[in-house]
Structure formats: structure tokens, C-alpha cells
């Protein structure tokens, strides 16, 4: 079989770096993580994403002590508790590059926040300069550490310290890591051949050709799995290994299942039994003595995002209900989605940032009928105005209606920070490992601006 290079083009949809980010954010949301440390944060694209506020308070955040709220979603098949928004309280980034950290300082600044998004929860942001093979006491016992597209850039003398420091000293509940799959590289050429181009192993240890000139290694599926299982056993963790990034095109030789995903991912969860805890305690003593030759990390910047002054302090339920009725009358609508009402002017402020309070108010108001939709998230539930519209405001106009009914979504329209495209790569970026995209609960790829562009992976294209 003879195929030219055009036939072997490989594309991903969504782009590979988006798929990595989606896996990461979905895992953080599923585990309800509130503290995230990004080692090798680069220019801070992940941190900038995490700085975006959730649209409402997390479950149990409201100061309303009505027991009705706590039981409101019992026995509901699908709600935001099943696929929650992220509610980070503290995020931090670590990197060795002053230049990259300068960019991260700008994109995580409260001054860069979108004023359209109300913030209902405070957030602390830290940026540290230092090598990842140096222990930072401020990161010990963090909840989650992430390392996306990082380890392949590390020399062997630094790589050997990653697991001992992260798993043995920092001891996060969750450690998430991604790295390119060398196994998948075969997808760019016919079996038994290798295209010219690419980047030869700079260490000379192998005859492999890598996706990026700065990569010190690229592991096969078996090599990555072996490394993950070894360090998980050594430090008392259980690991789940997988992959993301399947080519849109079918492989002419039927290798798709064998080659797997373009990016390898692993999720390490800490085990807290006596044996596992003992492993970490004993091992961390040796780690401290072996990594004290370099200077300590330097705190480059610390930001505090303040919550809205009304957060957790809702108004009277009747006042909230009347405000919602007013919106129905003003817009001339009889049925609205919960999200449509939530993003309407002062409604979230009256609710103190709690969507549970808003739903409670709708349940109790005689002119509002809450319509739960089985299998749908709360934002898609509907509220009907009982009796229909009885009046309209005198100053109503179609232009005003469109403006006031506009829904603010969590889809990010911020530009990517310093994103560069390298040959034979769909998103490996030194110092800026991924895009800046918030992962919402329901993502319609056909409607996300810019995501429909194919991410072409041409080995020789710059």
C-alpha cells in the first residue's frame, strides 16, 4: 500500500491541548478539589482558567440554615452536585522561568478578571519561582498537584526527584499528570517506516524521534505505566492510567486501538491506611536530606480575590421571588430556564450567590412553578410564571429585552497566552502547556468559537 504524506495527516477534534485540559478539569470537578498546585506552570494558562469564578456558590455554602435547602436535591437523578463546578480556594504555580512567571503574574491578576463574572468565593493565588526538585514547605499537604506536559522536558537528574517530592513530601490527595505517548508517534507513518523530520533524542540514549526539540524523552504506553505503578507502590498511592486524543481519521493499517491516545494521563490517589502512611513518612526523611543543595523557592506574587459582599447573605425569599416575577413580566416570557434568570441583573445578588436559595424561592412563590427535568443539570430546569404575563414595563423595547436577557456563560473567550505551534505537535508548549478554557458541564463543540479549527499535526510543518 502506498500513501503519500497528505493521506497520513492526523487531526484532533477538539484540539489535543483542549482534550488534555478537559480531562484535567473534569477530574478536578469530579473530585471536588479546592486547592490546586501547578508545577511547571509556565505562563499560567491553567491558573488563569482556575481564576475564573464559579457562577454560584458551592453546595452548603449558603448561610441559610433552612433544612429544606439541604434536602432539596435528594433523589434527583442529575444535578450540579453530580457534575459540580470548580470552587477553588487556593491555587499556586511553580516555575523556574522568570519570563514565564511575569506573564503568569499578569494573567492571574484580579485586575485582569472579567467584570461580567461575579465572584462569590474568595481565592488566593500564589506564584513561586524555583526548581521542582527543591522542597517548598508551603506546598506540603496540598490537596492536588498537577503536572501537564512537564516531565518530558526534565533531565534525568531532576526527574528522579519528582515522585519523591510530590508524593513523598507534598503528599497531595490527588496528583494528575500528562505526557506525550511515544507509542502514538507511529500513527504519522506507515508500519515499519519513520518520516524524516521530528527531533532526534537529544540525550543520545535512544534512536527515537520526538515531537519537540526540548523533549528529553517520550515514553511508550508500557514505559509510562511501569513508571506510574512503581512510584504509586513506593509512596502509597493508587493510580489510574489512561489516554486522550484519538485521531479523527481512521488509520489505514487499523492501528488505532493498538496505538491508543496521543497523550498519556494518570491520576494518583493517596491511600491513607497505616502501611501507606508509614511509607511516606519514612521516605520523606531521606528526600529532605537529598534535596537541600539548591536555594529555596521565591514567592513572586500573591493575590487575593475578594468575594462579593453579599455572598452567603441572601434577601428574604419573598423578595427574591418577586424579583423573578418582575423579570418574567419585563421580558414578556412565561417560561425561563434557571440559568436565564440567574444571570439577570440583581437576582444572584438577592440570592447571595446561592442557586439553591433561588430555587427555594421559586418553589415557595405562588406565581412560580419549578419544573425539574430528570437527567438534566439544574441550570436547565425551568420556571413557569403561573397565570402568564399580566403586565409589561412601559420602557420595554426589543433592544432592551435582548440586552437584559443575554446569558453570561462560563465559556472562556480570553486569548491564549503565548501559545506556539511546533512541528509534529498539537499542543506541546514549553512554559505554557495548555489552553485557557473553562470546562463547563455541557460543552457543545460546534458552538465553541475557535474550537472547530482542526489541529493539524504535520511532522514537518512549522
Each predicted region: which residue ranges?
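Conserved SAM-binding motif I beta-strand of class I
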Residues: 90-95
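A conserved beta-strand element that flanks and buttresses the S-adenosyl-L-methionine
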Residues: 146
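S-adenosyl-L-methionine-dependent methyltransferase catalytic module, highlighting the catalytic core
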Residues: 71-77, 83-86, 103-142, 155-358, ...
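Class I SAM-dependent methyltransferase Rossmann-like catalytic core
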Residues: 2-30
Amino acid at each position: 500500500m502506498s500513501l503519500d504524506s497528505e493521506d497520513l495527516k492526523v487531526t484532533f477534534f477538539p484540539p489535543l491541548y483542549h482534550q488534555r485540559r478537559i480531562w484535567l478539569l473534569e477530574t478536578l470537578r469530579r473530585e471536588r478539589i479546592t486547592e490546586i498546585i501547578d508545577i511547571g506552570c509556565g505562563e499560567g494558562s491553567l491558573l488563569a482558567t482556575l481564576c475564573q469564578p464559579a457562577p454560584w456558590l458551592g453546595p452548603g455554602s449558603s448561610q441559610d440554615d433552612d433544612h429544606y435547602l439541604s434536602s432539596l436535591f435528594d433523589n434527583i437523578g442529575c444535578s450540579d452536585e453530580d457534575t459540580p463546578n470548580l470552587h477553588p480556594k487556593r491555587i499556586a504555580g511553580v516555575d523556574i522561568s522568570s519570563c514565564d512567571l511575569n506573564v503568569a503574574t499578569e494573567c492571574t491578576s484580579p485586575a485582569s478578571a472579567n467584570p461580567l463574572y461575579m465572584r462569590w468565593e474568595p481565592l488566593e493565588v500564589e506564584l513561586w519561582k524555583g526548581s521542582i526538585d527543591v522542597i517548598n514547605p508551603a506546598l506540603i499537604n496540598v490537596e492536588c498537584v498537577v503536572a501537564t506536559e512537564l516531565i518530558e522536558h526534565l533531565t534525568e537528574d531532576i526527574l528522579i526527584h519528582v515522585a519523591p517530592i510530590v508524593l513523598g513530601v507534598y503528599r497531595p490527595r490527588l496528583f494528575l499528570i500528562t505526557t506525550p505517548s511515544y507509542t502514538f508517534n507511529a500513527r504519522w507513518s506507515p508500519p515499519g517506516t519513520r518520516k524524516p523530520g521530528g527531533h532526534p533524542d537529544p540525550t543520545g540514549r535512544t534512536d527515537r524521534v520526538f515531537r519537540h526539540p526540548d523533549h528529553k524523552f517520550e515514553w511508550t504506553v508500557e514505559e509510562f505505566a511501569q513508571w506510574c505503578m512503581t512510584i504509586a507502590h513506593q509512596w502509597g498511592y493508587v493510580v489510574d492510567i489512561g489516554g486522550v486524543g484519538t485521531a479523527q481519521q481512521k488509520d489505514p493499517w487499523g492501528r488505532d486501538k493498538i496505538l491508543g491516545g496521543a497523550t498519556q494521563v494518570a491520576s494518583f490517589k493517596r491511600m491513607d491506611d497505616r502501611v501507606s502512611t508509614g511509607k511516606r513518612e519514612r521516605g520523606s526523611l531521606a528526600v529532605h536530606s537529598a534535596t537541600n543543595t539548591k536555594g529555596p523557592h521565591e514567592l513572586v506574587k500573591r493575590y487575593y480575590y475578594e468575594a462579593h459582599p453579599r455572598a452567603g447573605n441572601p434577601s428574604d425569599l419573598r423578595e427574591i421571588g418577586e424579583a423573578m416575577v418582575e423579570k418574567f413580566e419585563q421580558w414578556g416570557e412565561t417560561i425561563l430556564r434557571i440559568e436565564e434568570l440567574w444571570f439577570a441583573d440583581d437576582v444572584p445578588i438577592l440570592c447571595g450567590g446561592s442557586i439553591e436559595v433561588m430555587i427555594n424561592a421559586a418553589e415557595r412563590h405562588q406565581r412560580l412553578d419549578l419544573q425539574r427535568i430528570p437527567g438534566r443539570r439544574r441550570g436547565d430546569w425551568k420556571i413557569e410564571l403561573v397565570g402568564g404575563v399580566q403586565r409589561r414595563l412601559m420602557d420595554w423595547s426589543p433592544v432592551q429585552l435582548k440586552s437584559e436577557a443575554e446569558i453570561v456563560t462560563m465559556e472562556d473567550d480570553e486569548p491564549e497566552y503565548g501559545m506556539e505551534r511546533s512541528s509534529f505537535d498539537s499542543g506541546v508548549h514549553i512554559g505554557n502547556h495548555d489552553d485557557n478554557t473553562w470546562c463547563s458541564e455541557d460543552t457543545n463543540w460546534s458552538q465553541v468559537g475557535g474550537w472547530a479549527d482542526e489541529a493539524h499535526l504535520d511532522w514537518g510543518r512549522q
